[in-house]
A protein has these predicted regions:
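Hydrophobic alpha-helical scaffolding
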Residues: 62, 112-117, 245-248
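Proteins with a high burden of low-complexity, intrinsically disordered sequence enriched in S/T/G/P/A and R
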Residues: 1, 5-7, 11-13, 129, ...
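Generic hydrophobic, helix-prone segments enriched in Leu/Val/Ile
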Residues: 43-49, 122, 199-205
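N-terminal Rossmann-like NAD(P) cofactor-binding subdomain of oxidoreductases
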Residues: 1-107, 111, 145, 225-226, ...
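Active-site-lining helix/loop region of Rossmann-like oxidoreductase modules
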Residues: 52-55, 67-190
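C-terminal active-site/capping subdomain that shapes the small-molecule cofactor and substrate pocket
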Residues: 148-152, 157-271
Length: 271
């Protein structure tokens, strides 16, 4: 069992940064996007007590599917604009399944409207990122209510999301304010100048036909998030499109950035 394997590594006094989902809901294991919830790292002290370690611990990454829209929602929350309801449809690249077109030829000219387990992760994991620390554990947030559909599309790299959001009554920001919040948002990796931290975490593109995978997936070397097409909606308050690199920001690269943050904050030290 992966949970057990990761704990065994940690018990050898080895810090573990994992892309696997096994420990994402273990109460004293932080699930971190470095710009969004670095404060969750404080539960590591309690986790070490449970594991009986001095240097070893586990930190995990959230699912790649949520990286294209959770930063956009988080920036608004931090600015005092709480989304109440969110609908997101993700269009996910085949590399997210560890595949290429060579070994998954049936994906050419095809769309598959189901990815096992992704919708549950996409709806629940943002709530854990927005949770709070209580008695050495992370307690997930109550809202917003998120519903998702996750679709596999014939693209090698890059997860796109079409997102609809409604705010609390009387707390709907203007379009200009939302774009300002997105463009100005930064987090601890930017403050600390971590080696792989994007200079500008979020870019907003004004063109109607952006973001595009072929043009924007490698924004900030794949560590940034590209947003566009923000406009008012007839059912919800606003809709927009997000794009992130699923294997850089969403997987291995994001894990490296977490390791850089852990070192900068003194959690990873020389033996």
């Amino acid at each position: 069992e992966i949970k057990k394997i990761e704990e065994e590594y940690a018990k050898t006094e080895t810090p573990v940064v994992s892309n696997n989902s096994a420990h994402r809901w273990t109460p004293d294991v932080p699930m971190v996007v470095p710009e969004l919830n670095p404060e969750h790292l404080e539960v590591i002290a309690d986790q070490k007590k449970r594991l009986g370690t001095t240097r070893g611990f586990i930190v995990v990454k959230p699912n790649c599917s949520i990286q294209s829209y959770t930063p956009a929602l988080h920036a608004l929350k931090k600015a005092g604009y709480e989304p109440k309801t969110v609908v997101a449809t993700t269009y996910q690249a085949i590399s997210g399944a560890g595949k290429t077109f060579k070994d998954w030829p049936e994906m050419e000219h095809n769309i598959i409207p189901f990815i096992g387990g992704e919708e549950e992760k996409s709806e629940q994991e943002p709530l854990r990122i927005w949770g709070h620390v209580e008695n050495g554990q992370i307690v997930k947030a109550e809202g917003p209510v998120i519903t998702t559909q996750c679709i596999r599309v014939p693209v090698q790299d890059g997860h796109t999301a079409a997102v609809f959001m409604t705010f609390e009554e009387g707390k709907k920001p203007s379009k200009e304010e939302i774009i300002r919040v997105w463009r100005e948002f930064s987090g601890m990796p930017q403050e600390l100048g971590l080696p792989n931290a994007p200079k500008h975490f979020i870019q907003y593109l004004e063109e109607d036909n952006r973001p595009q995978v072929s043009l924007d997936v490698n924004y900030e070397n794949g560590f940034g998030v590209s947003l566009g097409r923000l406009r008012e909606d007839t059912v919800f308050d606003y809709k927009f499109v997000g794009l992130s690199h699923n294997t850089v920001r969403g997987a291995a690269g994001g894990a490296v950035l977490i390791a850089e943050l852990l070192k900068a904050k003194g959690y990873i030290t020389a033996k």
